[in-house]
From Swiss-Prot:
Reaction(s) catalysed by this chain's protein: urate + O2 + H2O = 5-hydroxyisourate + H2O2
Gene name tied to this protein: Uox
In-chain residues carrying the UniProt-annotated modification Phosphotyrosine: Y288
Entry similarity comment: Belongs to the uricase family.
Positions of post-translational N6-acetyllysine modification: K10, K23, K27, K36, K118, K122, K164, K175, K185, K220, K277
UniProt cross-references to InterPro entries, sorted A to Z: Uricase, Uricase_CS
Binding site for urate: T68, D69, F170, R187, V234, Q235, N261
Name of the protein this chain belongs to: Uricase
Organism whose genome encodes this protein: Rattus norvegicus (Rat)
Annotated control of activity: Competitively inhibited by xanthine.
CDD domains reported for this sequence: Uricase (cd00445)
Residue list for modification N-acetylalanine: A2
Tissue: Expressed in liver. Not detected in other tissues tested.
EC number of this enzyme: 1.7.3.3
Length: 303
């Protein structure tokens, strides 16, 4: 028969590993008006705080709790007074506020996603106040800071869906009694990029670096516009993106990438007396292959 403790505060058999509380998905649209020229940042922000005391968990004592509604209001007010130059800077502002304003907060963790609005543009002329939603990659960041420590800053790209109709293959893999997959020299390659990297310090043009990483991802996936670039595996493309990124962007310390292999299969039309030469394909959402990898700069040799 199971035995239960009535006094959880005196339970010596468990210990806290990590605690936190906060507010998720606090949405803000910030408008910067410079005369008739307007700029916008729409974000969704999630904040988690860790407190020095655990008395709220142990005894139901809420005297140290900053209400999550207050956290939401703080995000709104910081957007007003600090603006949102970049989502990374905004996340650091939020961390700094809670750590400097409340001595019993020991850790602040802030995640921000930016809605992908792009200014209307035609023939090189930019509209002064109109924007279009362009879901060609979501900019996100993750900033964590402990008391008396520097902010640990990650940025990333997600929901960047790309496809090429050739210059991809998959050959030379292990074949056993359960293998039915044929080798292919030419196939469609489609994926939805998730990419996350860590900065070495905070003195970075975050917007420019994010754009540079996105350009590298597209460059290594697609190759030259007139002929493309062959990919022998998703793994090779993933690694090539990482190596080029770290070689060109010294402010980045490490990079994680996840590339699902989204399948498009040739539809068999032989029963209808037709030959389908990879012209009509069937998209399959799942199951799908998933390839991941993280690289970092090597530490200098001590020899």
């Amino acid at each position: 028969m199971a035995h239960y403790h009535d006094d959880y505060g005196k339970n010596d058999e468990v210990e806290f590993v990590r605690t936190g509380y906060g507010k998720d998905m606090v949405k803000v649209l910030h408008i910067q008006r410079d005369g008739k020229y307007h700029s916008i940042k729409e974000v969704a922000t999630s904040v988690q705080l860790t407190l020095r005391s655990k008395k709220d968990y142990l005894h139901g004592d809420n005297s140290d709790i900053i209400p999550t509604d207050t956290i939401k209001n703080t995000v709104h007010v910081l957007a007003k007074f600090k603006g949102i130059k970049s989502i990374e800077t905004f996340a650091m502002n939020i961390c700094e506020h809670f750590l400097s304003s409340f001595s019993h907060v020991t850790r602040a963790h802030v995640y921000v996603e930016e809605v992908p609005w792009k200014r209307f543009e035609k023939n090189g002329v930019k509209h002064v106040h109109a924007f279009i939603h362009t879901p060609t990659g979501t900019h996100f960041c993750d900033v964590e800071q402990v008391r008396n420590g520097p902010p640990i800053i990650h940025s990333g790209i997600k929901d960047l869906k790309v496809l090429k109709t050739t210059q991809s293959g998959f050959e030379g893999f292990i074949k056993d009694q359960f293998t039915t997959l044929p080798e292919v020299k030419d196939r469609c390659f489609a994926t939805q990029v998730y990419c996350k990297w860590r900065y070495q310090n905070r003195d970075v043009d975050f917007e420019a670096t994010w754009g540079a990483v996105r350009d590298i991802v597209l460059k290594k996936f697609a190759g030259p516009y007139d002929r493309g670039e062959y990919s022998p595996s998703v793994q090779k493309t993933l690694y090539d993106i990482q190596v080029l990124t770290l070689s060109q962007l010294p402010e980045i310390e490490d990079m994680e990438i996840s590339l699902p292999n989204i399948h498009y299969f040739n539809i068999d039309m032989s029963k209808m007396g037709l030959i389908n030469k990879e012209e009509v394909l069937l998209p399959l959402d799942n199951p799908y292959g998933k390839i991941t990898g993280t690289v970092r700069r090597k530490l200098p040799s001590r020899l």
